[in-house]
């Protein structure tokens, strides 16, 4: 069983054939790489504001590693990449063309943060802020 199968679905909207339907709004994604969870929200953005369509989260204890060893292990980078690959698929299903991927304290304070960010760009084509 892959890690993406363990994703916790918090709120699910309708996403069947979302990228094929004409619409007056656009779907945007927000990814949050936190200390204990990796989350992704899909939002419907239009002139009237934004509405959340879906929110996913997956537990991943990046903070524990960073705060005990100062680094993120290769195995955790692999798991993070797999989670983000699953999230990328969901964004594709919604027709998301714009996203922000934000790393919180754990990743920012890791001694190997440049390596991790580079791996995520290489493996997932995601730019992490």
Tell what function each PLM region has:
Residues 2-33, 41-129:
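Nucleotide/phosphate-binding catalytic cleft detector across ATP-hydrolyzing
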Residues 36:
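Primarily the dimerization/phosphotransfer
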């Amino acid at each position: 069983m892959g890690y993406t199968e363990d994703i916790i679905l918090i709120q699910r909207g309708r996403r069947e054939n979302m990228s094929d339907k004409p619409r007056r709004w656009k779907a945007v994604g927000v990814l949050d790489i936190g200390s204990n969870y990796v989350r992704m929200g899909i939002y419907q953005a239009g002139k009237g504001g934004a509405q959340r369509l879906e929110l996913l989260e997956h537990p991943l204890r990046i903070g524990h590693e960073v705060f005990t060893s100062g680094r993120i292990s290769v195995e955790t980078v692999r798991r993070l990449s797999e989670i983000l690959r699953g999230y990328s698929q969901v964004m594709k299903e919604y027709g998301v063309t714009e996203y922000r991927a934000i790393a919180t304290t754990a990743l920012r304070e890791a001694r190997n943060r440049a390596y991790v960010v580079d791996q995520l760009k290489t493996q997932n084509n995601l730019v992490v802020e």
